[in-house]
């Protein structure tokens, strides 16, 4: 099972927020996930990113691959993501 760390869209129409989730790469974007490790709200000024760092680092050490968008959000937050 290939595991990805990616964004799952939540919220109302035209007012999205996102959960940062760990899921199987074959699951739908907003479908089944293994764990919620954070959230991202682009509607706030400035955009708000909250992450459970210990859980995120544990999943990264287990081999989970973040998507490009998630890795950029984590870099802005100051969390090193392996290349």
From Swiss-Prot:
GO molecular function, one term: structural constituent of ribosome
Pfam family membership, one: Ribosomal_S16
Domain of life of the native organism: Bacteria
Family matches, as SUPFAM superfamilies: Ribosomal protein S16
Disulfide bond sites: none
PROSITE patterns: RIBOSOMAL_S16
UniProt keyword Ribonucleoprotein present: yes
GO CC annotations, alphabetized: cytoplasm; small ribosomal subunit
Keywords: Ribonucleoprotein, Ribosomal protein
One GO term of the biological process aspect: translation
Family listed: Belongs to the bacterial ribosomal protein bS16 family.
PANTHER family according to UniProt: 30S RIBOSOMAL PROTEIN S16, SMALL RIBOSOMAL SUBUNIT PROTEIN BS16M
The protein's name: Small ribosomal subunit protein bS16
Organism in which the protein naturally occurs: Syntrophus aciditrophicus (strain SB)
């Amino acid at each position: 099972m290939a595991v990805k760390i990616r964004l799952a869209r939540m919220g109302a129409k035209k007012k999205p927020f996102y959960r940062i989730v760990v899921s199987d790469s074959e699951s739908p974007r907003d479908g089944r996930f293994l764990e919620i490790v954070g959230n991202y709200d682009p509607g706030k000024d400035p955009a708000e990113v909250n992450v459970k760092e210990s859980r995120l680092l544990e999943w990264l050490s287990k081999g989970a691959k973040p998507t490009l968008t998630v890795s950029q959000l984590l870099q802005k937050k100051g969390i090193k993501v392996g290349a």
